[in-house]
Amino acid sequence: MLQLNSFAEISTLADRLPVADEAARAAALARQNSLTKPVGSLGRLEELSLHWAAWRATERPTITKPQALCFAGNHGVCAQGVNVFPQEVTHLMVKNFEMGGAAINQLCRAAGADLQ
């Protein structure tokens, strides 16, 4: 695993990233707009797919090894009274993820994605 020790190292690494392929983005947008659906009806997913097409330099990029990452924490939000569940529920929800009983598990299973 790559270890980065400073923001300068991250910046240097980012400078070496390939530039977006605008022709691929345009082709992906044209394809999106030709689909039988209202323009923009898939929300942010449409924007993400255009970014992915430009990044991969192809109109129809594929994801060969899908993976979902799940992060959980309380970070004091329960003390603010904005969460509908008590703090103890976080641990139980994560345990349910680990046991394969949550909606995210089913979505990952349907997509063939690994859940971490």
Curated annotation (Swiss-Prot):
Q: Which organism is it from?
A: Rhodobacter capsulatus
Keyword annotations: Cobalamin biosynthesis, Glycosyltransferase, Transferase
Question: Which gene name belongs to this protein?
Answer: cobT
Is the rRNA processing keyword given for this protein?
Answer: no
- Recorded GO terms, molecular function? nicotinate-nucleotide-dimethylbenzimidazole phosphoribosyltransferase activity
Q: Which cysteines does the record link by disulfide bonds?
A: none
Q: What broad class of enzyme is this?
A: transferase
The UniProt family comment states: Belongs to the CobT family.
Q: Which Pfam families match?
A: DBI_PRT
Q: Which reaction does it catalyse?
A: 5,6-dimethylbenzimidazole + nicotinate beta-D-ribonucleotide = alpha-ribazole 5'-phosphate + nicotinate + H(+)
Instruction: Reply yes or no: does the keyword Kinase apply.
Output: no
Query: Which EC number applies?
Result: 2.4.2.21
Q: Name one GO biological process term.
A: cobalamin biosynthetic process
The protein's role, per its UniProt record: Catalyzes the synthesis of alpha-ribazole-5'-phosphate from nicotinate mononucleotide (NAMN) and 5,6-dimethylbenzimidazole (DMB).
Q: Identify the pathway.
A: Nucleoside biosynthesis; alpha-ribazole biosynthesis; alpha-ribazole from 5,6-dimethylbenzimidazole: step 1/2
Origin: domain of life? Bacteria
Q: What is the official name of this protein in its record?
A: Nicotinate-nucleotide--dimethylbenzimidazole phosphoribosyltransferase
